[in-house]
Amino acid sequence: GTMTESVAAKNGDDVTLTIDRDVQWYVKKVLKEAESKYGAAWAIAVVQDVQSGEILALADSDEVQAGTDAAKMSPSRAVSETFEPGSVGKVISMSGYLQMGLHKMSDQLSVPDHITQEGQTYKDSFDHGTERWTLAGILQNSSNVGMIMAGENYPDEQRYEYLTKFGIGQPTGLNLPGESSGLLTNPSAWDLRTRNTI
């Protein structure tokens, strides 16, 4: 005959979601409005409590009915799509400048609205004369030019190290299906534009 072993069932642990349904509803609403307003193919948002790390909302503009085969087969774009983090990278770079002692937040730089290096021109998102900004002012104004100037002595290896310390190019640990770790190339492959815009 066949031998079988029977193992008694045990109660599982409680699972508590950190999603706030009101925040989730509002985020979905804003995403649909933004998608329509800007003619975007889709939109995503993640709202996180910065103190606890809890995810309060994780949404994309796609309409998929929960529990359906489509929902099971389609991971959320909020975790599966790779995208450029944009000006969030300025905060990461700035933390590296400060930790390495390259700058203090009170250091001042004369920042024009554009700069050209090796035939490539980089601009701020708004026109302005040459401004005397502290590093805090550069961050406040989200100045691309100011960040390039402040990062002139910031080694690529250190830049890469800080990006990885902040989780760029790595999975989040949410363990959601289809999660992408993103893309972060080795600094040995960076060209000037990558270095200045990463």
Where are the language model's segments positioned?
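Extracytoplasmic/periplasmic proteins that interact with beta-lactams or build/remodel peptidoglycan
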Residues: 1-44, 64-67
